[in-house]
Amino acid sequence: WEALGLSYPNCWESMISIFLNATSADGYNPYRITSYGIDWEIIEPDDSWSHIGYWNDHQIIYVLKLLEHFNNTNPERLKQLFGDPIFSYANIPYKIKSFKEIANNPKKTIDFDFEDHNKIMDLVDELGSDGRLLLTKSKDIYHANLCEKLLVLSLAKICNYVPGAGIWLNTQRPEWNDANNALVGNGTSMVTVYYLKRFLEFFKKLTSQIRIDNIDISLEVLLWFNEVEKTMFKYKNINHSTISDQDRMDYVSSFGKIFGNYRKKIYSNGFSTSKKLSLNKLRSFISTICNQFDETILINYSKNGLFDAYNTINIDSKY
């Protein structure tokens, strides 16, 4: 896509739209996009090899590259998209479990909702590929702006951040390729921390170029952000180098439960209405989390001049 976009720069906007329209309300993306719309893997009860899950890197690394190229080509149009509610959400029949269930078994964290899948297929028969998208009660496509879409992707990763270790790989898939399968559940990604910091700095810079103080986002996303921001302030001064395992688990469980509460709401009822988000508050939050990432990045720097790519962790649910 990058090579194609460099040859045909007018395609950047369409590429970004295709990518973001296929991300879900819980911050992940489906298996693939075909001429029939978004597609996902299906659990087959009689096939022990059938499997579902979300790869952890797609939502940040790939879309960041597209956004950076588009910003270099047409920055004014990118700023227009920031507040335009033209993006959709993929309606994937995967339900990520509660934090307690994830902590108890981080290798088995997603349920396939057969009833929801069948309802979506009925909607596809009625509406075409739009039936695979998140809809309102009147069966219209639910739309969000670029700010909300980027915020959802960011919060999904931040809520799985383990201080000193990276982003927890707890959605039944690895990153990059199947060579990392052993990291599923008991691994963390520093690769995504490095890119997420770059992603958030790009996001922050974009907000500073928008000549408004507040922006409309879905109420449920705003409440999620407010809880994460408040909890992040609580842990603002933790030392990532000396943090105890007990405090680290407390940090992880605090954000994990916040994310779980958000997912429970949207899985049951979707989005309701929109409310104003303060861009100053968003920028301050991004600065705080990036400072925490800096500490973790230093911890993962080796004397040979290289940075660690992945770590392993042991989640003790009794904490």
Stretches with model-predicted labels:
Residues W1-Y319:
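Acidic, mature catalytic/reactive cores of soluble proteins
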